[in-house]
């Protein structure tokens, strides 16, 4: 999701997955099994949340409760991971850089949480792709996908992150980007970038899964012709999903931003389930949210997702909690722990998952 005040950003910990019951097996690398995910000895449907802000926390205790490209060095106390300046890329491996992510991963390992680690953001919040565009003198946003200097710096960051966590079972998947778009582009542009980047990641780490992080745009299956189903944003969901080095599909849902009805979200979910079923890969309903009436509007999507063949997990946007500094960021979509919204969106949803699958 694009946020004007806060971010979904480069080096994002975009999602956290947890089994809706105590794992029956030993911790290990997450994988796919047909149209489902397998996590720590369980195969089935899983639930989780998006918590982009965890990677920026400076208080380790806050991490236990619960990333950023720049063109100039931020002020003291700001976490950032990569600096683009004077045509050069510098990876910040210090205490206010990747060492922060180290602790997030360590905490996830300790608490049995699986992380989706994202490498760049389509949007400008906290830098994103346009930080690369500006840093290497490219013309516009869409140059990110094919500019040689940009891709060299992007892969430098990928290598720096992947190499730190190749042995961590807390990593659910590596994600190419948050909501990559190439408006007005031929679909070959994103396809070629997805194919080459996912192949590169697999060459560094063949054990962890790789996903795109896209919104699911560009799909013929069950299409009603509305904007999200079109190819305007340069994406072809089914074609991209068929790339061998992409392990599962991702799709998002924000009707208020896309000009669709809330009920339409059920069609969108079913369409992607059908596309993933045709591809023989599971789908992750990776982001969804509204700014009000969470229980009334979002729980029907959860029920549809749980009962749609081809969809094997969902992550609502976004998790909220009370930190040492106060409440975690709230963009209006936030569902805070301990609230009535949390009960319907999480507690009741997990109970439904457990009941459907016979998990205790």
UniProtKB/Swiss-Prot annotation:
Substrate binds at residues 142, 178, 254, 317. SUPFAM superfamilies: (Trans)glycosidases. It catalyses: Random hydrolysis of (1->4)-beta-D-mannosidic linkages in mannans, galactomannans and glucomannans. GO terms for biological process: mannan catabolic process. Its main location: secreted. Keywords: Carbohydrate metabolism, Glycoprotein, Glycosidase, Hydrolase, Secreted, Signal. One of its GO terms (cellular component) is extracellular region. The active site is at 179 (proton donor), 287 (nucleophile). Its EC number is 3.2.1.78. It comes from the Eukaryota. It is found in: Secreted. Glycans are attached at residue 307. PANTHER family: MANNAN ENDO-1,4-BETA-MANNOSIDASE 1, PTHR31451. Belongs to the glycosyl hydrolase 5 (cellulase A) family. Endo-1,4-mannanase, a crucial enzyme for depolymerization of seed galactomannans and wood galactoglucomannans. This is Probable mannan endo-1,4-beta-mannosidase A.
């Amino acid at each position: 999701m694009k946020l004007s005040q806060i971010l979904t950003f480069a080096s994002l910990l975009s999602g956290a997955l947890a089994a809706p019951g105590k794992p029956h097996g030993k911790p290990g690398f997450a994988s796919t099994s047909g149209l489902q995910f397998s996590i720590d000895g369980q195969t089935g449907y899983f639930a989780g949340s998006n918590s982009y802000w965890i990677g920026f926390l400076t208080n380790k205790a806050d991490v236990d409760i619960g990333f950023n490209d720049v063109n100039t060095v931020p002020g003291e106390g700001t976490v950032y991971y990569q600096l683009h300046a004077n045509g050069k890329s510098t990876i910040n491996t210090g205490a206010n850089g990747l060492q922060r992510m180290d602790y997030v991963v360590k905490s996830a390992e300790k608490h049995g949480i699986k992380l989706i680690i994202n490498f760049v953001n389509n949007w400008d919040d906290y830098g994103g792709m346009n930080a690369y565009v500006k840093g290497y003198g490219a013309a516009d946003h869409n140059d990110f996908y094919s500019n040689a200097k940009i891709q060299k710096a992007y892969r430098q960051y990928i290598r720096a992150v992947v190499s730190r966590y190749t042995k961590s079972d807390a990593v659910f998947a590596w994600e190419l980007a948050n909501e990559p778009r190439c408006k007005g582009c031929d679909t070959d542009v994103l396809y070629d970038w997805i194919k080459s980047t996912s192949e590169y990641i697999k060459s560094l780490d063949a054990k962890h899964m790789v996903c795109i992080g896209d919104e699911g745009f560009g799909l013929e299956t069950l299409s009603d012709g509305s904007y999200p189903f079109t190819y305007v944003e340069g994406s072809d969901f089914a074609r991209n999903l068929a790339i061998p080095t992409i392990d599962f599909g991702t799709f998002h849902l924000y009707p208020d931003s896309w000009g669709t009805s809330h009920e339409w979200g059920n069609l969108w979910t079913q369409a992607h389930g059908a596309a993933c079923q045709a591809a023989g890969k599971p789908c992750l309903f990776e982001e969804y949210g509204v700014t009000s009436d969470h229980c009334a509007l979002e729980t029907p999507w959860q029920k549809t997702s749980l009962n749609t063949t081809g969809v094997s997990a969902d992550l609502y946007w976004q998790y909220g909690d009370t930190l040492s500094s106060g409440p975690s960021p709230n963009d209006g979509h936030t569902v805070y722990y301990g609230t009535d919204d949390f009960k319907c969106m999480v507690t009741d949803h997990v109970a439904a998952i457990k009941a459907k699958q016979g998990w205790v």
